[in-house]
Amino acid sequence: IMLQTIAGKTVIVVDVLPGGQRPYFIKSLGLNGGVYIRVAGTTRPADRYMVRELLFEGSNRSFDQAICSELTVSEDDIDALCRAMQEEARRNARSDEQRAAIKNVGREQLLSWGILAEKDGVALATNAYAILTGNAAVPPAMIQCGVFKGKTRAVFVDRREYGGPIWEQIEQAYQFVLRNIHLGAEFDGLYRQDVYEIPPEAIRELIINAAVHRSYLDHGAIQVAIY
C-alpha cells in the first residue's frame, strides 16, 4: 500500500500480488461458479477449462506435463517419436549449417522436456506426448481452416480440418493458406521471384504460435480464416 500523486491528486495505491494457491473463488458460489478472471479490462466468470488450468498452476503443474494414464508407451514408440522429431527438424532447416547443427533426440531429452515422465525406471507418456503424436487418449486438438466468400463467414469457398501429430497439423494449415492467398512476382533483370501477398514466414509463425500457446484443456479447435 502506498500513496501516489496523479494529476495533482494523492491517491492510495494497493498492489495485490497473485497468490500461489489458485484458483481463488467466492465461497458462496463454489469453485465451479465463483472463479472470476480479468480479460481486457473486464471481470468475467472463468469457464471450466480455465478453472482446470488454474488448478494445475496452483499445484505447480501443467496439463502438458501431467501423466496421460490412458496411454502406454514402449521403447519402440519413443524411438519412433525421436526419429520423427529429427526428420522434421531436418526438413525445416534452411541451410546446411542448420542441418548439421541438429542434434540427436533421445529418451533423456524427452524426459527433460516433459514429453515423458518416469517412475521406477519405467517411461510414462504425458499429455504432451499424446498431443505431439496425435494420440486419441486426449481430446483431439485440431486446426480448422476455411476460405470465405467476401468479408463474412456466411459462405464457405473451401474448408479443411487437420488432426494428427501437431507438427503435421501446422504444416498442413500453412500449406492451405499458401494455396489460397494471391501469388505475385517481382523481377530483377531477367530473374523472376514469386512473392506471396503475405510473407510465408509470418504465416508459419502465426500458426505455430497459435498451436504452442493455446490451452489444450480447451477442446475447441484453432481456426484459420481467409477472406
Question: Where do the PLM segments sit?
Answer:
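Conserved N-terminal catalytic/coupling substructures associated with nucleotide/phosphate chemistry
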Residues: 1-227
